Amino acid sequence: MAGKKKSKSDSLPLDLDNIKPLDHLQPVPKTRSSSITSIESVDEPGTMKQVLLPPTIREFDELDQFESFVRDETWDNDFDYFHGKLHYYPPFVMKSCQNNLEKIKPTMNKNSKKFRRDLHHHIQKHLIKDLEKCCGYELNFGKGEIVETDNKVTWKFKDETDHGFSKEEEDLYDRHWRLELDVSCTNESAMVDVEYKSIPM
């Protein structure tokens, strides 16, 4: 990817036990202004209004890379404006096949009660807790919602709280944001998809 700046995660390995929490908010980065564009207002035709473009989607195929990306967004003061996707085999799958992808059982998918139970445990006890460390602030996703179709199951989580900061501090810097986390698997494989968004409000 020509033109992309070298990320901190290229040189600094992820250490979940030594990530410094985000103690205080800061002003919105000046670079954010390049993501603002003008569009015609739907409510008042003929008038223009400024909107923030969606952040660039970054895609990953390893959990460590994805978590490093989330950590780096906090370090770069972009914790309230990012969008990452992860397509991976969860650790419990890799452990069961002893890190040999050819040994993954074809029954390891959304139709297996054991697979779903293990994935739900991984989401609640590992993924969300690790993302909270990487973000550096509180995540309040609660139980979430499970949406199921014939070939896919998705756990949907949303956090619209103050993330552990005071309302005064959020108002001072105009830093109000919501988080959306979707984790899904299909009936075709043990591969899991994660979509994680931080959206300014």
Swiss-Prot record:
<keyword id="KW-0472">Membrane</keyword>
<dbReference type="InterPro" id="IPR022554">
    <property type="entry name" value="RGI1"/>
</dbReference>
<dbReference type="InterPro" id="IPR038235">
    <property type="entry name" value="RGI1_sf"/>
</dbReference>
<feature type="region of interest" description="Disordered">
    <location>
        <begin position="1"/>
        <end position="38"/>
    </location>
</feature>
<dbReference type="GO" id="GO:0006112">
    <property type="term" value="P:energy reserve metabolic process"/>
</dbReference>
<protein>
    <recommendedName>
        <fullName>Respiratory growth induced protein 1</fullName>
    </recommendedName>
</protein>
<keyword id="KW-1003">Cell membrane</keyword>
<comment type="similarity">
    <text>Belongs to the RGI1 family.</text>
</comment>
<dbReference type="Pfam" id="PF10843">
    <property type="entry name" value="RGI1"/>
</dbReference>
<comment type="function">
    <text>Involved in the control of energetic metabolism and significantly contribute to cell fitness, especially under respiratory growth conditions.</text>
</comment>
<dbReference type="GO" id="GO:0005886">
    <property type="term" value="C:plasma membrane"/>
</dbReference>
